[in-house]
Amino acid sequence: MTAKEIRDSFKSFFESKGHQIVPSAPMVIKDDPTLMFTNAGMNQFKDIILGNHPAKYKRVADSQKCLRVSGKHNDLEEVGHDTYHHTMFEMLGNWSFGDYFKKEAIGWAWEYLVDVLKIDPKDLYATVFEGSPEEGLERDNEAASYWEQFLPKDHILNGNKHDNFWEMGDTGPCGPCSEIHIDSRSEEEKAQIPGNQLVNKDHPQVIEIWNLVFMQFNRKADGSLEGLPAKVIDTGMGFERLVRTLQGKTSNYDTDVFQPILKAIAEMAGTTYGQDNQKDIAMRVIADHIRTIAFSITDGQLPSNAKAGYVIRRILRRAVRYGYTFLGQKQAFMYKLLPVLIENMGEAYPELNAQKTLIEKVIKEEEESFLRTLETGIRLLDKTMNDAKAAGKKEISGVDAFTLYDTFGFPLDLTELILRENGMTVNEEEFNAEMQKQKERARNAAAVETGDWITIKEGDTHFVGYDFTEYETSILRYRQIKQKNQTLYQIVLSDTPFYAESGGQVGDTGVIVSEFETIEIIDTKKENNLPIHITKKLPEHLDVPMMACVDTEKRAACAANHSCTHLLDEALRQVLGTHVEQKGSLVTPESLRFDFSHFQKVTDEQLREVEHLVNAKIRENIPLTEYRNLPIEKAKELGAIALFGEKYGDEVRVVQFGNSIEFCGGTHVPATGKIGMVRIISESSVAAGVRRIEAITGAKVEELMDTVQDTLNDLKALFNNAPDLKVAIRKYIDENAGLKKQVEEFMKEKGAALKARLVENAKEINGVKVVKAIIPMSADVVKDIAFQLKGEIPANLFVVIGSVDNNKPMLTVMISEDLVKAGQNAGKLVREAAKLIQGGGGGQPHFATAGGKNPDGLNAAVDKVIELAAL
């Protein structure tokens, strides 16, 4: 079976068992503060599992694209070194929300593997939770009894809490699980060692392929367990491992999931996969990482230096580094693999082809940028090695190696490889200590203590913010969080007009008011689609009616800026072309930011045209047309624009202002006239193929215009209220340029005369012409004089000049090449003498400069240079 046939067979099987087949959620997560990426199939169902929302379907199945770069078996630096771990992978899964449980989950897993896929039963093993006395948990005898209907007892193994008790996090739903393992060894190997001795022993041919999680508990903040009201089945099967098993391969990379990409890489590198272990590792790294990078960009995450973007950049750079080091790829190459990836996976994930141009451009620019950084890093490593050799050492410090890692993306193994080639080593203990310090810093910065939810009353949350900014409500539950030595409280309300941060729009602020007190809401966030109201103070009376009141001034400003982004999007399409797609946005009360796909700088003329179009739509005062709970197919028929990387349900909200029609959950003005006016204040590049416009609206435009007018008035006053300010400024610039030229010519004449005087006054010491002086000249003039002197006296010349410019002392030393060969070094001399002017400096052996703070020490510094030179 091909990979496509296997994926389709899984969906068909569970569809026949009454499961709703749902599309994969985006790999990039936007509304869960605990995760950056989808790392399991259950992520998109977290709200249901946590009880925040009811399940639309009781039974669900899908194939989910996932990304893991940490955790059990997922150290990024190990990917590529074995044949079955990946960063990006597909997870086949089926779920039950309060419907079937262990019996059906185990029975259907067996039916699919054995009856549909025809896997030999004697090669299968199942693990069950052995229990935990300290938790008061018994062995999962229920699961074991169901497995005994299919497997002999020696194929049913007990597993410890680490392997067979699944937990969502430190708190939340959890429960025992059953792993299904398959033994793919030869019959001879099986005869020598039984498979049950190799389960969970990291044997490359005895691997886990499916995990059946039976969620039946909730882990509280104090570590105790309580039963879940509705039990959940959550299963996940590694697609790549399953394909490998069914295609009879010993490596995931030998399957049709990876082979087309590996062949393309080998062709680029002029090699063959399977002939050289180090090259094979490099090719596996690249084949794995190109999938991760392409899907991440498709789902809206560009490489960057922060958070999720940094993870993607790190993965991309790791792949480039392997290509550079082991496959001779000194130019950008990964972007050329995209057509092969699309041909291989584009049918299952059409968004890849839809975003092809953007993905290629982003990857290519990132590669080229890192290759430049790599060259810089190599030069720095060369200098570090030379300094160590000069000091008689064969080891560089771990601190230097960590700087290379942290600043230039040099993993330790690349540094070690280059050092080995030069007969040197690195202090790994120091490097590891620096790495540990960085991890501690990151851990402390991100540390959050989250308490249990305290329930005041049962119920669901209803958002009423599209229609109301004040609404009567009550507190359903709350919890305490501690972060960065600050205690905050998160509150869930029964009904809320507060918009929770999402879709680029910041969350509402305001107050909740009862007859006893007023509590300030400092922010509103969304956690798995649940609005969370954040406050510094918990109400003393939690079970009384309250009024939730949004800050209407901030809300109105946000609404104006959000509606403006829609008009801006439409105008950009008109001016630049239909290739323009939104790639991100930020809507605050103060301003708006809009990122979009475009492959060159937007000209000033184009920006002006866009701004005029938007302002024309504002003046038209186009009323808002809003569609709520619209079936997604109907929304598409309307022509509504959806964003790549966003997850939409079966029903959506659509916002329309004339020709601008978009899927959107944000708050908007009732008519475009409420925006007032827009002014674009900047346009810049975010990444390859992605531009950014920043703009302001309404009162902020008035403030800007006032500032501009004030500046204009000040300029007019400076030019005596000249009738034509532009002409007056041009005349001033021209006159200034003329005067500057006169000064330069005067300084040249003065410098020439000074140079002649210096040559005349030069002293000869032991055959060396020594030019020593202190002059009131700028650093540039002194430098010119020094090089002119060298031109006139090419041998046996030693120049030391002290100068003062704007009360800042400067020391300049120039030495002829023959004296340098004899052992003189201007850089070393300057560094030592600069201490006398309270400064520092350096340079090359033949020319160096130093600046300082103490002009009074200049004479002593000049004499010190002569003394140190020992002429």
From Swiss-Prot:
User: Would the keyword Aminoacyl-tRNA synthetase turn up in this protein's UniProt record?
Assistant: yes
EC number of the protein = 6.1.1.7
One GO CC annotation: cytoplasm
Kindly state which keywords UniProt assigns to this record, in alphabetical order.
Answer: Aminoacyl-tRNA synthetase, ATP-binding, Cytoplasm, Ligase, Metal-binding, Nucleotide-binding, Protein biosynthesis, RNA-binding, tRNA-binding, Zinc
Name the SUPFAM superfamilies for this protein.
Class II aaRS and biotin synthetases (SSF55681), Putative anticodon-binding domain of alanyl-tRNA synthetase (AlaRS) (SSF101353), ThrRS/AlaRS common domain (SSF55186), Translation proteins (SSF50447)
Q: Please state the protein's primary subcellular location.
A: cytoplasm
Give compartment(s). Cytoplasm
Where on the tree of life does the source sit, at the highest rank? Bacteria
> What does it catalyze?
tRNA(Ala) + L-alanine + ATP = L-alanyl-tRNA(Ala) + AMP + diphosphate
| UniProt record, GO biological process | alanyl-tRNA aminoacylation
The entry's free-text remark on the cofactor is: Binds 1 zinc ion per subunit.
Cofactor dependence: Zn(2+)
Question: Could you say which residues bind Zn(2+) here?
Answer: 562, 566, 664, 668
GO MF annotation list: alanine-tRNA ligase activity; aminoacyl-tRNA deacylase activity; ATP binding; tRNA binding; zinc ion binding
Aminoacyl-tRNA synthetase as a keyword? yes
What this chain does, per the record?
Answer: Catalyzes the attachment of alanine to tRNA(Ala) in a two-step reaction: alanine is first activated by ATP to form Ala-AMP and then transferred to the acceptor end of tRNA(Ala). Also edits incorrectly charged Ser-tRNA(Ala) and Gly-tRNA(Ala) via its editing domain.
Instruction: Reproduce the free-text note on domains from the UniProt record.
Output: Consists of three domains; the N-terminal catalytic domain, the editing domain and the C-terminal C-Ala domain. The editing domain removes incorrectly charged amino acids, while the C-Ala domain, along with tRNA(Ala), serves as a bridge to cooperatively bring together the editing and aminoacylation centers thus stimulating deacylation of misacylated tRNAs.
- What is the similarity comment for this entry? Belongs to the class-II aminoacyl-tRNA synthetase family.
* Protein's name according to its UniProt entry: Alanine--tRNA ligase
